[in-house]
Design a protein with these regions (language model features):
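Short, well-ordered coil/turn segments that N-cap beta-strands
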Residues: 1-2, 37-39, 65-72, 91-93, ...
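Conserved, mostly hydrophobic/aromatic
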Residues: 12, 32, 95, 137
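Active-site mouth loops of central-metabolism enzymes
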Residues: 4-26, 71-80, 106-116, 138
Length: 138
């Protein structure tokens, strides 16, 4: 089965120079999920700003009412529980966990041994499971 995951609403390099207001994110998410049949929508990166948090809360509230909550995803980081706390507080239930896949990234960017990064990932995934937050690893 092929699924479409849209990242338009996650402000950042994929939409360089573009930042959506909360009402715009809500309208776009509604069109993507209801009208275009997109399977999954990544709506934000965790911990970006207070404005982003409020936008995610607004979209998540609509998604919960309309049966689309499991289709909303938020990019999170291997940061203990910080991203999970943000995502859960915003009302979302799916984290796309950004993990490093190359030795160079782990050792030079994170300054960790690969085993430590794997342990850190495991810690986040286990905590997410306790909170009933689904995890996709990237």
């Amino acid at each position: 089965m092929i699924e479409i995951m849209d990242t338009t609403l996650r402000d950042g390099e994929q939409t360089s120079g573009v930042s959506f207001a909360a009402h715009e994110k809500l309208s776009i998410a509604q069109v993507l999920l209801n009208d275009l049949g997109v399977n999954r929508v990544e709506i934000a990166s965790a911990r970006v700003s207070d404005g982003e948090f409020e936008a995610v809360k607004r979209v998540a509230a609509w998604a919960a009412r309309s049966g689309n909550l499991d289709k909303l995803e938020v990019l999170g980081f291997v940061d203990g529980t910080v991203s999970l706390d943000w995502i859960e507080s915003a009302g979302c239930r799916v984290v796309n966990l950004l993990c490093k896949g190359s030795y160079k990234h782990v050792t030079e960017q994170l300054r960790k041994a690969p085993e430590q990064h794997v342990d850190d990932i495991r810690t986040v995934v286990l905590e997410a499971a306790k909170r009933k937050i689904d995890v996709n690893i990237y």
